């Protein structure tokens, strides 16, 4: 079918042409039905599809693709990837280096077009037909039966078109062309995979003779919240009756007097169509509510509203709304929700599915919301565009505060290689040709999402510098919707219009610098719209930020970057499932694994980082002394009596006593509760208090553990004296043996053999170790360069001297190591008659910061099961112990590794605060004991992890088990991933005389 096609390269590149014939924006209606006919028909499913490299290139043969979906992701499933591949870049634009372009220009040689086509037949009784594209990346043009209908940009908000005049009886043909790049691509430089397609649902809809075009629900409250006034501002087309039912009361009005209505339909550059008028009428209904049930994340109370349209007394349309009553305001330089100072415990959330990209299923959205709720997250920033409306509906229902962010990021036009390089090309600034394009994006979001109580703040976009246009956007938000505040982080970079943002918002600022800023600039509340960069093994020091929110009233929390890794599910070269990141499809330029920076893995498995988030964001802070619990209730609206307080004592991880108490403590207050029984005084004695949710809440079941606190003391007594073992000193080796055990130390090598019950446990020689596999954060701050010596120091340490002495109950073997810089490191092995070996390594050099200080034990492959007494059940690090609970925990070495680095291998799997550990399997095992040491058991050495960039590049995971016992391992950091080191208190150092002592045993 030939198309009347007005789309040209010049049109696509022109920032002043961002829509043609697009209908006015309006609120999203989650439930709009008619008893007589369907009002909406989904066109999701299989569409005919063909592809061209650019506007002048020939199209491919017809194929079939699925809508919603991305062209490039579906192309991956076809031989040769005929429709291109996903392309990942962060700040730089995807055409950088391919074509020299400036804003107002777009790629010509490579600007792929995907042409979708399908037929449809109108349902009976439809007198009109409209098309809704809920998401088209990045621009789309529409034809019906070959007649040009319209054009739209702005990837993440709906575009609606009137196709009625082009419809004919019987079968109709709909064609949609999607363009990968347009002028709007300069405004959509978000940190994500660059792809194109119809990635959200496509729908047809009709309008009955009387129709609800729009509704805006507005609220006001008495000062003490004892009453509320709720107003429904409605726009209605056609003639008939409109009825609103709310809180048990019904109000109605007659409509039908024609009124001229600017439809917003645009032809060319802003020229309104003079022939378009509709009989749209404004009508309002106001309801009084006594003692309203207020909405909050803790108590997401929703009222049901129903708006009915009748024609000559017959119902023709019904719209359901859920209304949350809440007041959000800025008062005395603090943000208040329902009169209470709010603390945002948030995450940034890109829409993502590892198989379908930003086409996210409802099941995945529900999983996300429930997962956030059960990890004490109370807020989401929709980075950096409006989310699918269903996600916002879930936030309303389950209780999550939302920063709704405009689809705007021009990062690459001003930030060059990490520095502010703003110039005449910086967008949007005050450039008049971009003004309407930018402001329309704000209007589209506000109009669609204005009735969601979860949205507390409108954001002007992300990382788009500053200037007049952004200030005008903020003023639009305030004028149109004074019930919300306005956010924009970019004023940090450009203070020309500081009033653009109602709050100071920054990214990745250390707590110390936040304190300094607020001391000098206390004019506004402060939030971190991005902090604690979750790339790889990260999020160290996260609790510092949360604790500061309860010390400084002006600091009101922040949003972790980010919620989910953006890995793409693929089959790796070894035939196993895996995840791809930037560059894996040959995409260049690329920022490689920078898209893998989430708390949750691409397939929605939680990492141990989420354990720390849950603890840091807990609604209760529980601190224990030896005799009482001090519980700070950090809720805004929930009393402490909503929780059962479970007191449990244990010795060496074994339960002793248990009691359940309840206590009253108002939100914001603190309670002191004396232990119902004494802390034991034997072994590793521990008291644990857990706060258990008594009643179910949306997304949270009864019995949910909201918070916990612990205190423990080690009362371990001295061991019994036993006869010394036998010393066997020969020319090449020194042996120490006793009943059912034998240790052999090779001269020039060190500890080369451990046999228990006649079974060899070592796979290779035990060695000192000072190295960990670099994390993304390590690489970002050049730590491998700074510490490179310590990689070789352990690998090539030379055991120059071996001595042995039998004295008392011990045989002590000293292995004197020489490091590549010439310094010596003595390690003493004191072995008793039971086969227990006390190991002490003592630093002889000067003050030195090390990545790690300990010993590495390559064990036999059969030893795969770990049981330990320490912080668990999953990984903890020196700067991320929050969420780790003292107890006895068990794991399989290979299965444990799989949950940490399925995308980009790096250091992982450590356990801190370990007092004892056993590694067992199909052969007799080995035990380790220390005084709260760091312990890990992995299938790989740090060097093997470091050498791999994907899982398939690692050696087989069943060749050995690598145990490391450490005095310390440097913290993982996470203030950012491009220069920030871990905090000073977890950048550990040794000095002359520093020693590490632990024990191995049968």
Role assignments for model-derived ranges:
Residues 116-118, 157-161, 281-287, 669-675, ...:
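Short strand-edge motifs at loop-to-beta-strand transitions and within beta-strands
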Residues 190-211, 566, 575-624, 634-642, ...:
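Catalytic cores of secreted or luminal carbohydrate-active enzymes
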Residues 144, 227-270, 283, 305, ...:
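Beta-strand-rich binding/interaction modules
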Residues 2-7, 12-19, 33-34, 48-52, ...:
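Accessory beta-strand-rich segments of carbohydrate-active enzymes
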Residues 71-77, 83-89, 180, 296, ...:
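Beta-strand/loop-rich accessory regions of lumenal/periplasmic or secreted enzymes
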Residues 2-35, 70, 147, 186, ...:
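Extended substrate-binding grooves/exosites of carbohydrate-active enzymes
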Residues 127, 167-171, 289-302, 680-686:
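Short glycine/proline/serine/threonine-rich loop/turn segments at secondary-structure transition edges
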Residues 82-106, 153-155, 163, 167-228, ...:
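An acidic-aromatic loop/edge-strand motif
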